[in-house]
């Protein structure tokens, strides 16, 4: 059985914690899309591990971890992250790690281009992480990108890299500060170190599914950052939902969605339930809302059920993991976005609009809930939660039509209620 963990909001929902719990039984843990722009922390046995490109199943010594074909793969980040995990005691990580030979290579060139493209946008910048994810996927779509298996054909690899660099140099001129020969030299070293990790991921996943082992797939980013279904253009450059998993790994999974009990977003783009006042600052402080990858503070606001329902309609979730319920413990009153209203007609929308200009003009309809103002961190059973917290969770289920199966009440692996 293959299980996917997907984010339903704008990322940072707390997917890593559920991944850590479920990967204890998994024998394969895989990433399907994205790159080292994603980031989450896993706390296990009192140690905090940071993951960006590598699957977090590496915490389990019995689990093989695969970076799939839909990922844009940065070799330097791969070895740096692996070394950091080994320094923290994961001595088994190296032998439990595989990379698809079909994955696209993310280059230093892409990162430099990413920065220049953001500069071109000036006041309309996307707010990328600057890791070159967009340019990598752009090269993939243009069919002039470099795949992992091509690293090992030195002549072909170097010729393709020089052509890419020349093309960008024509576009940006002296603004592009990049030495192609330095990058080529780095890959001569990688060419010696990388072969033991590279596999045909299609055959590997086919064999794993046929064997009947538990497979866990970690979704990166989240549905509202999806290139097709997110708040375009303020999105990432890959399919972050179910479609990206299917193409990135070729699996037939069940789908677990992870959502915070409130809402956050990093970078630019529309965020209808954002609170820029006292409540938003309080959520940011209590929830420790700053990014693992960039350190940027996350924008915070109330739970937006319009977003969650839309996300569920795209990804066909089978269950929710509602995270960070404990962050709401001290709020006397909670607000939940339940509809968007057309400012001219006053009618509530029955859909999440693609037109961001129109969405920006829409008003948010909130429902207020009484807060519980009591700690939930030590609670292990749903029936032991305060009545108001139970009502909050049940309303999420009722509104979205998807059952809540896990509730996060703290950062630790054991801070989870199972329903």
Curated annotation (Swiss-Prot):
Binding site for IMP: 12-15, 37-40, 129, 143, 221, 236, 296
Biological process, per Gene Ontology: 'de novo' AMP biosynthetic process; cellular response to cadmium ion; IMP metabolic process
Pathway in which the depicted protein is active: Purine metabolism; AMP biosynthesis via de novo pathway; AMP from IMP: step 1/2
EC numbers for this chain: 6.3.4.4
Residues bound to Mg(2+): 12, 39
An example molecular function term from Gene Ontology annotations: magnesium ion binding
Active site (UniProt): 12 (proton acceptor), 40 (proton donor)
Cofactor(s) the protein needs: Mg(2+)
Binding site for substrate: 292-298
Cellular location(s): Cytoplasm
Stored InterPro entries: Adenylosuccin_syn_GTP-bd, Adenylosuccin_syn_Lys_AS, Adenylosuccinate_synth_dom1, Adenylosuccinate_synth_dom2, Adenylosuccinate_synth_dom3, Adenylosuccinate_synthetase, P-loop_NTPase
Binding site residues for GTP: 11-17, 39-41, 298, 324-326, 408-410
GO CC annotations, alphabetized: cytoplasm
Enzyme type, top EC level: ligase
Catalysis performed (reactions): IMP + L-aspartate + GTP = N(6)-(1,2-dicarboxyethyl)-AMP + GDP + phosphate + 2 H(+)
Cofactor note: Binds 1 Mg(2+) ion per subunit.
The entry's keywords: Cytoplasm, GTP-binding, Ligase, Magnesium, Metal-binding, Nucleotide-binding, Purine biosynthesis
Function in brief: Plays an important role in the de novo pathway and in the salvage pathway of purine nucleotide biosynthesis. Catalyzes the first committed step in the biosynthesis of AMP from IMP.
Subunit composition and interactions: Homodimer.
NCBIfam families: PRK01117.1, purA
Family statement drawn from the similarity comment of this UniProt entry: Belongs to the adenylosuccinate synthetase family.
HAMAP family (alphabetical): Adenylosucc_synth (MF_00011)
Protein name: Adenylosuccinate synthetase
Protein's organism: Chaetomium globosum (strain ATCC 6205 / CBS 148.51 / DSM 1962 / NBRC 6347 / NRRL 1970)
